[in-house]
């Protein structure tokens, strides 16, 4: 089973509830949130602490230092190996997350085009000249679908997408397989809810992150090299707090960081919705209208119908 959908819809809690309900069958959770791969990035990614995981094994959490680069290809290999091992043990893998390319690469066994250092270097020079915002806008003109899935602040993935487009002469998404039967016959459950309801959840979520110590978490990670990280430093919340600290770290700068984090998360949710809604295999559930037990019933009903 895969549980996907926009940020803030309750995917992690549903995964825990489903795993508990499966009981004797055994279930293990495989993370598909790119920023939860990083050790120490806990508050800003809403990562479940160990004591909240109900004794259920979790995979692909805390596997990278913040100075390491997260790549879809590395994740695909590692997560697929985890899933194969879980299945071999007779248990049920539950993939959970909202990182669009990570999920598609895993469920559709995406093959990644080769890279060309000269082409990559040319786009990196262009990045240095015009900045990531202009480069992302260029990607949006060439391949709107790829731009929708890549954060406007994500220089590395923007460069990679433009490199693939130049090398293949096709949109970046064209290197993905056609949507067919998902790998491992995975049942894909989508969680979403009314925009007004989700906006309120995101506002509370953002406030909670700052109140629970996001600024202190970022400060500690800066001492471990966060600023040098190609992908970790650009994560929502972390990038905004870094900018606020660089500007003096006063109350006004941190207030702006909080507002920018909320606004950036809402924009990211729109991209997630656009991406996931194109996948006809997703069985959507209303996280705002259904009680947790009903969500579990619906998810397991869909899974049992297929399995």
Swiss-Prot record:
InterPro entries, A to Z: Dimethylallyltransferase (IPR039657), IPT (IPR018022), P-loop_NTPase (IPR027417)
Subunit field text: Monomer.
GO biological process: tRNA modification
Residues reported in the UniProt entry to bind ATP: 5-12
Entry protein name: tRNA dimethylallyltransferase
Similarity section: Belongs to the IPP transferase family.
EC number: 2.5.1.75
Molecular function, one GO term: ATP binding
Role: Catalyzes the transfer of a dimethylallyl group onto the adenine at position 37 in tRNAs that read codons beginning with uridine, leading to the formation of N6-(dimethylallyl)adenosine (i(6)A).
């Amino acid at each position: 089973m895969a549980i996907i959908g926009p940020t803030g819809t309750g995917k992690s809690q549903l995964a825990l509830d489903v795993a508990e309900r499966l009981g004797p069958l055994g279930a293990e959770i495989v993370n598909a949130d790119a920023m939860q791969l990083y050790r120490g990035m806990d508050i800003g990614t809403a990562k479940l602490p160990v004591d909240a995981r109900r004794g259920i094994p979790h995979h692909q959490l805390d596997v990278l230092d913040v100075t390491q680069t997260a790549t879809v290809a590395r994740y695909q290999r590692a997560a697929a190996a985890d899933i194969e091992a879980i299945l071999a043990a007779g248990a049920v893998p539950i993939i959970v997350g909202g990182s669009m390319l990570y999920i598609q690469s895993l469920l559709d066994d995406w093959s990644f085009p080769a890279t060309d250092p000269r082409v990559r270097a040319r786009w990196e020079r262009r990045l240095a000249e015009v900045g990531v915002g202009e480069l992302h806008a260029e990607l949006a003109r060439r391949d709107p679908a790829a731009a929708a899935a890549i954060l406007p602040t994500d220089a590395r993935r923007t460069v990679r997408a433009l490199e693939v487009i130049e090398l293949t002469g096709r949109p970046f998404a064209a290197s993905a397989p056609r949507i067919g039967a998902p790998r491992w016959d995975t049942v894909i459950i989508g969680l979403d809810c009314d925009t007004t309801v989700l906006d309120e959840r995101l506002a509370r979520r953002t406030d909670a992150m700052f109140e629970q110590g996001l600024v202190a978490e970022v400060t500690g990670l800066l001492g471990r090299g966060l600023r040098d990280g190609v992908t970790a430093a650009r994560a929502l919340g972390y990038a905004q707090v870094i900018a606020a600290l660089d500007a003096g770290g006063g109350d006004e700068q941190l207030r702006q960081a909080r507002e920018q984090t909320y606004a950036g998360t809402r924009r990211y949710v729109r991209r997630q919705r656009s991406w996931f809604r194109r996948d006809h295999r997703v069985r959507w559930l209303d996280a705002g209208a259904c009680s947790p037990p009903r969500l579990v019933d619906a998810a397991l009903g869909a899974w049992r119908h297929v399995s």
